Each structure stands twice: as structure tokens, then as C-alpha cells.
From Swiss-Prot:
Active site: T200 (nucleophile)
A single Gene Ontology CC term: cytoplasm
Chief location of this protein within or outside the cell: cytoplasm
Function field: Catalyzes two activities which are involved in the cyclic version of arginine biosynthesis: the synthesis of N-acetylglutamate from glutamate and acetyl-CoA as the acetyl donor, and of ornithine by transacetylation between N(2)-acetylornithine and glutamate.
Annotated gene: argJ
One Gene Ontology MF term: glutamate N-acetyltransferase activity
Annotated pathway: Amino-acid biosynthesis; L-arginine biosynthesis; L-ornithine and N-acetyl-L-glutamate from L-glutamate and N(2)-acetyl-L-ornithine (cyclic): step 1/1; Amino-acid biosynthesis; L-arginine biosynthesis; N(2)-acetyl-L-ornithine from L-glutamate: step 1/4
Keywords assigned by UniProt, alphabetized: Acyltransferase, Amino-acid biosynthesis, Arginine biosynthesis, Autocatalytic cleavage, Cytoplasm, Multifunctional enzyme, Transferase
The protein, known as: Arginine biosynthesis bifunctional protein ArgJ
Binding partners and assembly: Heterotetramer of two alpha and two beta chains.
Length: 413
């Protein structure tokens, strides 16, 4: 598919129409059905034609799944270098002990043999039901098709990583570094068990930029803190979530670092990709009908701004009110109050869809019909001004609908 670019005046980069994980030079991606799911794609891969500087961040859940343990160890041994990633859905390979780790390493070996690269340059990821062993005969079948061009489409990869998601999530942007075109692509999955500090969420980012692994890791950690770690669907944190980035140096320019004159341009583009994917995950929450954005400003610290934003968007009462299109701002105030952060009610100002509802801690009369009309929109915004400092943060989530219970009551069946 021919890619088209659209440039917004507020960005120093272009959003590539139909852009994807394999839009950056030197990357291919694919996916196929190997029988882990009844009739949907369930096995995917990314391959770079050259060795890529790589970095990853992982779940904070102490029951870290086998593929994450193996990938983390692999990146340490390879000193942040990868050339391929393989991922399966429908089976998390979590709580599977030493066999789970052995199976993840065997998967690495099979992929490495097919691509004729060292196994320490292969990352592995899984998502799905916890507590079941991988059916390795099916996994092997998948690895044997990695070089088959019939399955080598980014769309197939996007589908292969899904579980309860209702749609694929992907993007690519381009920018100029030293006068040369650099591209950043991304793909993600996530719908349920999404909570700050990442959960049942996988995100993969590729770029043809020239950047070293340690710089890439610092950038990824910083970006994740205010993007992927600022989303919540249901407050659960999974064993398998990971964000992984590969930069294969195929565009030859001065190595990117904080000293590069166009470093901030690259950072802005990278953060945009992460934010886009994070919001797409929040919007696709299980049973969700609305995306919720909570903008907190005037906090004494970034940590307070983030915590208050996440507390509001995690509140089941707030989420239920948004689903019911009910302007029950008392639930927002309650969440702010129990967040554990420093606040002063007399300085607190709240807007719901840009309509003031609280000023200096007091309720504000508003047009109920106008408010009701705005709450029918698919994107609901909550703005909180604390009046205590200059720190700000944004959290993303979704409403809580009847379908959330229906979906999760029958997840294994």
C-alpha cells in the first residue's frame, strides 16, 4: 500500500496515512493462524534486515511471565541488540515455571535458525490466558513460516497480537534528521487488564533512525512514564505487558543523543507515537463506549499530577457515570480527595467537557441539557486545576459498561 503523509502545523513531523510497524526502512512484519485461537491470527513477528539498537520496559507485576524474563535476559546478554521479535496471542506462557522459560528459549532458537541469526538477537512476547503451557508443536509451525512472504504483511502482525481487542492499533510518522527522512512506526494491543505501570498491554515501536541502545532506553522509559503508564481500563495489572523498541540505523545521520540539535524533534515524534498507541488502547477498553482524558494542572509535583489523574480515571464510579452520561462531578471530587496527594479544596477548579462544574471547591450551576449533549460524545475530557504549583499530567481511560462484565465473565470459554 502506498503511504501518504499529512503534516500538522503544530508538529515537526508528518503522520503517515496507513503507516505501520514495518513502514521504517529495513523492517518487515507478518502474522498467521497456527491454532492457538479458534479462527483468528495468533502468531506474529517483526524482522529487521540489520541489527537494531533495542530497549524494553516491562510490567511491575511480580509474577513476570516467562517471555519477559527471557527477553530481559536476552537484551542484557546482547547489550541491547535485536534483529527479530516473535509474539503469540491466546496463551500468556505465565505461571508456567521453568518449562515456560525453556519454551520461550526454544522459540527463540527456532526463529534464529529460520532467520540465520543468533538466538540472543531474538525477543519473545506472549499474551492471553495465564497458567497454560505453550503448545510447542504449533509454535514451531509458526516459526517455520517466518520467511514466507505470503504472511509478511503488517496488518497480519497487528491482528496476530490481539486478544479481546476490537480493533488493531498502529501508526507511523516521519521527520527530518540532518536533512534525511527518518520514520517511526508502532503497533500495540490492549483492551482489558490495563492499568498504570502497564498491563496486558504489548506495544512495539520501530525506527530506522541511528540511535544507541542506552539512549533509546532512557527515551523509552521517559516516554512510557507519561504515556503507557498513564492509561487504565479496569485497574488490573498483568504479568505480560511490555513495550519494546528497535532502531536499525538504516538512515545514516549523526547519532541521535541529547546533544544532537534535532533531538527534541525526534523525542516529540517518538512521544506522539507512544501517546497515540496509549490512547488507542484506552479507547478500546473491554466494552468501552467512550475515551476519557483527565488533564491535571497546577499540582505541586509531577508525581501528584499523575497520581490524581490516574485516581480519577481509575474510579469505577467516575467511569460508570461517564457511561451513563451523568454529570456526577461529585465522584470526580471524591477521587481527587482520596488520591493521597496534597490539595486545597479552596483552590480546586474542575471542568467536564470544558463546562465548569467546580470552582474553588464549590459546585457551579451549569446547563444540564448542554452538559448532557456533550456527554454523548465518544471522547470525554475532565480538566482539574489544583492551583498549588506548575506541574501537569494527563491520564487516559474509558467508561465502564455492562459489556465489560459479559466479556470477562466468559474469557476462558
Amino acid at each position: 500500500m502506498k503511504h501518504q503523509e499529512t503534516t500538522s502545523q503544530q508538529y515537526n513531523f508528518s503522520i503517515i496515512k496507513h503507516g505501520d510497524i514495518s513502514t521504517p526502512q529495513g523492517f518487515t512484519a507478518g502474522g498467521m493462524h497456527i491454532g492457538l485461537r479458534a479462527n483468528k491470527k495468533d502468531f506474529g513477528w517483526i524482522y529487521s534486515s540489520s541489527l537494531a539498537s533495542s530497549a524494553a520496559v516491562y510490567t511491575l507485576n511480580q509474577f513476570k511471565a516467562a517471555p519477559l524474563i527471557v527477553t530481559e535476559d536476552t537484551l542484557q546478554k546482547s547489550k541491547g541488540k535485536l534483529q527479530a521479535l516473535v509474539v503469540n496471542s491466546a496463551n500468556a506462557n505465565s505461571c508456567t515455571g521453568q518449562q515456560g522459560i525453556d519454551d520461550a528459549r526454544q522459540t527463540q532458537t527456532w526463529v534464529a535458525q529460520q532467520l540465520q541469526i543468533p538466538s540472543e538477537h531474538v525477543a519473545v512476547a506472549s499474551t492471553g490466558v495465564i497458567g497454560e503451557y505453550l503448545p510447542m508443536d504449533k509454535i514451531k509451525t509458526g516459526t517455520e513460516h517466518i520467511k514466507d512472504t505470503n504472511f509478511a504483511t503488517p496488518g497480519a502482525f497487528n491482528e496476530a497480537i490481539l486478544t479481546t481487542d476490537t480493533c488493531t492499533k498502529h501508526i507511523a510518522v516521519s521527520l527530518k534528521i540532518d536533512g534525511k527522512t527518518v520514520t517511526i512506526g508502532g503497533s500495540a494491543k490492549g483492551s482489558g487488564m490495563i492499568h498504570p505501570n502497564m498491563a496486558t498491554m504489548l506495544a512495539f515501536i520501530t525506527t530506522d533512525a541511528s540511535i544507541e541502545s542506552n539512549t533509546l532506553h532512557q527515551l523509552l522509559k521517559s516516554s512510557t512514564d507519561h504515556t503507557f503508564n498513564m492509561i487504565t481500563v479496569d485497574g488490573d495489572t498483568s504479568t505480560n505487558d511490555m513495550v519494546l523498541v528497535m532502531a536499525n540505523h538504516q538512515v545514516e545521520h549523526q547519532i541521535l543523543s541529547q546533544d544532537h540539535p534535532q533531538w527534541e524533534t525526534f523525542v516529540d515524534a517518538f512521544n506522539f507515537v507512544c501517546t497515540f498507541l496509549a490512547k488507542a488502547i484506552a479507547r478500546d477498553g473491554e466494552g468501552a463506549t467512550k475515551l476519557i482524558s483527565v488533564n491535571v494542572s497546577g499540582a505541586k509535583s509531577i508525581s501528584d499530577a499523575r497520581k490524581i489523574g490516574k485516581t480519577i480515571v481509575s474510579s469505577n464510579l467516575v467511569k460508570s457515570a461517564i457511561f451513563g452520561e451523568d454529570a456526577n462531578f461529585g465522584r470526580i471530587i471524591t477521587a481527587i480527595g482520596y488520591s493521597g496527594c496534597e490539595i486545597d479544596p479552596k483552590c480546586t477548579y474542575v471542568q467536564l467537557n470544558q463546562i465548569p462544574v467546580v470552582d474553588k471547591g464549590m459546585a457551579v450551576l451549569f446547563d444540564e441539557q448542554a452538559m448532557s449533549n456533550t456527554l454523548t460524545h465518544e471522547h470525554v475530557t475532565i480538566d482539574v486545576q489544583l492551583g498549588l504549583g506548575n506541574a501537569a499530567a494527563t491520564a487516559y481511560g474509558c467508561d465502564l459498561s455492562y459489556d465489560y462484565v459479559r466479556i470477562n465473565a466468559s474469557y476462558r470459554t
